[in-house]
Design a protein with these regions (language model features):
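Class I SAM-dependent methyltransferase SAM-binding "motif I" and its flanking Rossmann-like core
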Residues: 121-178
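Sec/Tat signal peptide C-region and signal peptidase I cleavage site
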Residues: 3-7
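Extended, subdomain-level signal for the structured scaffold at the beginning of enzyme domains
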Residues: 8-119
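Generic detector of leucine side chains in alpha-helical contexts
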Residues: 1, 53, 60, 77, ...
Length: 178
């Protein structure tokens, strides 16, 4: 193989899985809304609400690790939606990728899946992805998050980056525990 053929086969720094229409919805009116869901069982009505707010456009799940397991679940809850996609963004390189940013900018709803919030902090902070997400929130598209995905939607994030974590007793005794 030539050098250009090898370069053409280079794996992208992200993973992308899409079901439903392969063509992006356009000219969709969205309504601002936020769902902050703790860990545990997903709440069907919360996802249905986000789909309604999205104008049945393109629903995007983002995460740093994991699978596309949300895709069929959300498509079943929101059968009139244009598409459901999962974008796995596991590095700073992926968080600065043109395709990732274009996909964020084309979504009518964004959901941040649960996982390890320190991955979100390490991989996404101060990247083009971070800026694009803030822009989309300001533009008023519906957003949501589960567990760690909820955590990174807030102003302050506990990520356990500096130590192995904190117990409830330690946090109650000293909320500024480092």
């Amino acid at each position: 193989l030539s050098g250009s053929a090898i370069a053409a086969k280079k794996k992208p720094p992200y993973e992308y899985f899409r079901i439903g229409s392969q063509t992006d919805a356009s000219n969709i009116q969205t309504t601002r809304g936020t769902v902050m869901m703790g860990g545990g069982i997903d709440v069907d009505d919360a996802f249905k609400w986000i789909c309604t707010l999205s104008g049945d456009g393109d629903f995007l799940i983002i995460r740093a690790a994991g699978t596309d397991a949300y895709n069929p679940y959300i498509q079943q809850l929101c059968p009139n939606g244009n598409s459901v996609a999962t974008l796995i963004i596991p590095s700073v390189n992926a968080a600065n990728d043109e395709f990732v940013i274009a996909t964020i900018n084309a979504a009518e709803a964004i959901w941040i899946a649960g996982g390890d919030q320190s991955n979100y902090v390490n991989f996404w902070t101060n990247t083009l992805l971070h800026s694009a997400l803030k822009d989309r929130i300001e533009q008023g598209i519906p957003f949501g998050g589960t567990s760690a995905g909820l955590d990174v939607l807030t102003q302050f994030i506990y990520s356990a980056l500096l130590n192995k974590g904190v117990t409830s007793a330690q946090a109650l005794k000293d909320p500024f525990n480092k």
